[in-house]
């Protein structure tokens, strides 16, 4: 093999190696930023991983919103997909459109049976429902009617709120 051909071969091999490394880094970065969505039933059945960032969505159960008396930023509420209910704790300012009987998607981590949210997103008008929540409700054959607060029995005292650290 002559020198010119060897140089071309080396250049092609280094280029391919660089491309493979670049693709591997992109795949790794995308994997780290992916938040998997779980509805309340999947979370209640234990399908959601513990201490891994996920997205949870559903409707806020009427009568479930509780604020800590000594910490106005500490909020507990429950989300439902009309089959199961999951308690959520959140430390921070809720969006202005957050309300009972409305759709939310929260990003956070499961800690035991409680979803500790680091971010809560609320619907942006009365007709909007997050796509994941709408799909979950459709799969559960629900029309969008919100269950009554009698179906949710909040704990008598607030759970200890843990701040999500990312």
Swiss-Prot record:
Residues holding heme: 124, 128
Record region (Disordered): 133-166
Compartment(s): Cell inner membrane
Keyword flag Transport: no
Alphabetical keyword list: Cell inner membrane, Cell membrane, Cytochrome c-type biogenesis, Heme, Iron, Membrane, Metal-binding, Signal-anchor, Transmembrane, Transmembrane helix
Biased composition (Polar residues): 142-152
Basic and acidic residues bias spans: 156-166
Membrane topology: Single-pass type II membrane protein
Coiled-coil annotated residue ranges, if any: none
Cytoplasmic side: 1-8
Any one GO MF annotation of this record: metal ion binding
Transmembrane parts of this sequence: 9-29
Gene Ontology biological-process annotations: cytochrome complex assembly
Main location: membrane
Residues exposed to the Periplasmic side: 30-166
Record-level GO cellular component terms: plasma membrane
Family to which this protein belongs: Belongs to the CcmE/CycJ family.
Main function: Heme chaperone required for the biogenesis of c-type cytochromes. Transiently binds heme delivered by CcmC and transfers the heme to apo-cytochromes in a process facilitated by CcmF and CcmH.
Protein name: Cytochrome c-type biogenesis protein CcmE
UniProt source species: Psychrobacter arcticus (strain DSM 17307 / VKM B-2377 / 273-4)
